[in-house]
Amino acid sequence: MVKQLKFSEDARQAMLRGVDQLANAVKVTIGPKGRNVVLDKEFTAPLITNDGVTIAKEIELEDPYENMGAKLVQEVANKTNEIAGDGTTTATVLAQAMIQEGLKNVTSGANPVGLRQGIDKAVKVAVEALHENSQKVENKNEIAQVGAISAADEEIGRYISEAMEKVGNDGVITIEESNGLNTELEVVEGMQFDRGYQSPYMVTDSDKMVAELERPYILVTDKKISSFQDILPLLEQVVQSNRPILIVADEVEGDALTNIVLNRMRGTFTAVAVKAPGFGDRRKAMLEDLAILTGAQVITDDLGLDLKDASIDMLGTASKVEVTKDNTTVVDGDGDENSIDARVSQLKSQIEETESDFDREKLQERLAKLAGGVAVIKVGAASETELKERKLRIEDALNSTRAAVEEGIVAGGGTALVNVYQKVSEIEAEGDIETGVNIVLKALTAPVRQIAENAGLEGSVIVERLKNAEPGVGFNAATDEWVNMLEAGIVDPTKVTRSALQHAASVAAMFLTTEAVVASIPEKNNDQPNMGGMPGMM
């Protein structure tokens, strides 16, 4: 494909037009009085949203140079969303401010490399100051405040707070669409996996079609069990203890399944067989998780273990197991706490190292099941459009809350960034490096300025007063009042604010040091003239 090129000022100005188009569409949503953006959807109703990253992803510009500029800012939003889960609009506003101010200086003859050094220096000091001003999130009310501010809805904040209280900070909280009007919270305690009983004759409650096992033994193996004789010695030991058993295996079939069902119907013993969850290597890992949670040993050829040699002390135990047609839930496994903690740490390390979103999601699910359970927030709304918008807000609020628990909170509404202004202004530098520091200084006030303008106020007036206010005191755009932001519950997660600043600075620095842009020339549609119809035939 043939390429076209632009150089120096022409290249940067073309990309700046793209940056401005995307940023101007996104920044109208920031703050409590931010507006919505309507996104056209080809086969469904238009989506109305104020979620920065969702808007950014939809923008595709016709001009290839402008589109590259837009994609750079889109990358800021995506990266911030990936790391912190929220703060995408703040990151976009910061990136636009740094790029605009930086480009003015480059046009005036400043050295882009010097500007980059100044930007990096200023951001490092700003991030350190943010961490110094950060406060830990320690109770349920503070968690609810973070969620409520992010979603602009107190009820959502309360649901997230309750969910985190019940399943722990590492627990999985999923967001699903409800068929009703109301939003509800549902909690599944313990480890649940999507495999049910292998025969309906295994149920203990025929009305509910559920098998409920109290204080059961749990056999965990990756083998197929076809012969009843293979597990008979083990089952005899279980029968003597007068306790039920859950068999988790690759598959229970043939003679083994028939005899388990017959003995269950005769009342000889209570046994429920389920297929092992997952596939391939993931199945092995999930079986190990279950074994660690319940104190079992996985019966596998990898360890040189055979079912015939299995004894009762190789089985795990739990306070309760519930098996339905589709799911198995293990509650309060009796595994060793130290082993569980070690497994949790291992999974956290794998989550940090993996580059695959799919793998990360599956690892987080496994972590949650070990750490305490799964909570489901079922989102209700009056229309499909409202449902989608509400679901996006809850996802952002959940991510914000997790970030707050991880790194603490700072004053919200852009106040935290202005609070570090003084520290950054004390950096000693000269020449283009000093100019780079000044670019960041101006950008630090951009979110507050935009929040004020979205509320119909003069941004510059609010910024100047905020610079002279006590640390933590900020402008509440929802009520047009000056308040202590932390006391008023107007807070932002430190991780979100920090990530937004770092990613915005990174892209701005790359933008300013760009000297040439290479783009593909769009192919023209050379429509062929219509062929005349065939002449009539005799």
From Swiss-Prot:
Question: Where would you find this protein in the cell?
Answer: Cytoplasm
Q: What is its EC number?
A: 5.6.1.7
Q: Which Pfam families match?
A: Cpn60_TCP1
Query: Does this UniProt record's set of keywords contain Nucleotide-binding?
Result: yes
Its recorded reaction(s) are: ATP + H2O + a folded polypeptide = ADP + phosphate + an unfolded polypeptide
Extract the GO molecular function terms from the UniProt entry.
ATP binding; ATP-dependent protein folding chaperone; isomerase activity; unfolded protein binding
Keywords attached to this entry: ATP-binding, Chaperone, Cytoplasm, Isomerase, Nucleotide-binding
According to its UniProt entry, one GO biological process term is: protein refolding
Any idea which positions bind ATP?
Answer: 29-32, 86-90, 413, 476-478, 492
List the NCBIfam families. GroEL (TIGR02348), PRK00013.1 (NF000592), PRK12849.1 (NF009487), PRK12850.1 (NF009488), PRK12851.1 (NF009489)
Annotated family: Belongs to the chaperonin (HSP60) family.
Q: What is this protein called?
A: Chaperonin GroEL
Organism equals Staphylococcus aureus (strain bovine RF122 / ET3-1)
